[in-house]
Amino acid sequence: MKREECLLVLAGLLARVGFFSYGIYQDAHFAVKYTDIDYHVFHDAARYVAQGNSPYLRDTYRYTPLLSWMLVPNHWLQWVHFGKFIFVLFDLLAGVMVMNLLGKCGRRRKLILASLWLLNPVVITVSTRGNAESVMAFLIMWFLVHLRNRQFALSGFVYGVAIHFKIYPIIYALPISIYIRSSEGSRWFLRLLTMGIATLATLVGCGIGMYYIYGWEFLEHAYIYHFTRTDHRHNFSLWNMLLYLDSSGVVPTTINWAEFAFLPQLFICAAVTYVLWEAPTFQNMQCVLFLQTFAFVTYNKVCTSQYFIWYLLFLPSFLLDTTLSGAKGIFLIFLWVGTQAWWLYNGYLLEFEGKNMFYPRLFSACVTFFLANVYLLAQFILDCRRRNYQTNIKKTN
């Protein structure tokens, strides 16, 4: 890395140390804690692992055992916060690879775009609160770096680990296939087969290994649970009210809506890959991954702040060749932040002041946030299509 890039990474590290230190202070002095409640779940699960037991002895642990293994040093060192440093490390490494994938654009532009991850307060807050999304961010960027370098077996291996860690990256299989089909000439099928076998072998291998150690509870908690998940706390999703009423039994129904909630999002995620057919380049594939992830989070039955990390990871690459004006960009940011703030205000009144805000206030906030994100998605798709049109015009001239 060049000197300016090293300084940016250092600034990102110092910012994270600052947020981390403040978090310890807030935990000790304020009623509202800085540390994510899920981090305590990870920590407790790691204690069971350190004792030679299953992490699934901890109620609400719904993740791969690999995550609990990563936090075992918390108990060796007798310091609950050590695991946050692990997540911060993955966060910074993801930022380095984001910068790497920006390629050879102008120095100033590259630093500004990389700052959208490395100096982003949302990203920094998530990792320093002890959320594990930075591990996923690292794995996704790592497999993309290998894919760009045409290291298909390595890319497939890392991609398989990413899917094992969390299921959602499986939606990237279609744009990856389209990209390889269009960029590898007559050897495209062999390249695709190589990556596919590596991905499947890794995914199945990890699954068999975890099943051998922990049995059915691994499958039940790490995978099956997420298809019928009905969380309604801290949930920005349009499905929030329906899931709340369904889980509370207030409105009796014979239909488990949580099982069908994924159908619209899968349709949208598949549909946006059409944009890649227009210009099947690696850069455009990253834009499509951004569109897919944004759509997936928007239409997901559970949508919390940590899920925003999933698409913010691709934002620097998406904005590399954007046609959006500065004024339009500011408006979109205001729309995203404003509708989110309205939801958070109502959520605060519900959770910390005990007011019944579910209907109509919180419901209307969910609808408003959803519609705002649908509008944002439409603008992003139009932006991609304008770029593809300009690229194709240049090729014909």
UniProtKB/Swiss-Prot annotation:
Annotated GO biological process: fungal-type cell wall organization; GPI anchor biosynthetic process
EC number: 2.4.1.-
Cross-referenced Pfam families: Mannosyl_trans
Swiss-Prot/TrEMBL keywords: Cell wall biogenesis/degradation, Endoplasmic reticulum, Glycosyltransferase, GPI-anchor biosynthesis, Membrane, Transferase, Transmembrane, Transmembrane helix
Predominant location category: endoplasmic reticulum
GO cellular component: endoplasmic reticulum membrane; glycosylphosphatidylinositol-mannosyltransferase I complex
Superkingdom in the source lineage: Eukaryota
Protein's UniProt name: GPI mannosyltransferase 1
Originating species: Eremothecium gossypii (strain ATCC 10895 / CBS 109.51 / FGSC 9923 / NRRL Y-1056)
Lineage: Eukaryota, Fungi, Dikarya, Ascomycota, Saccharomycotina
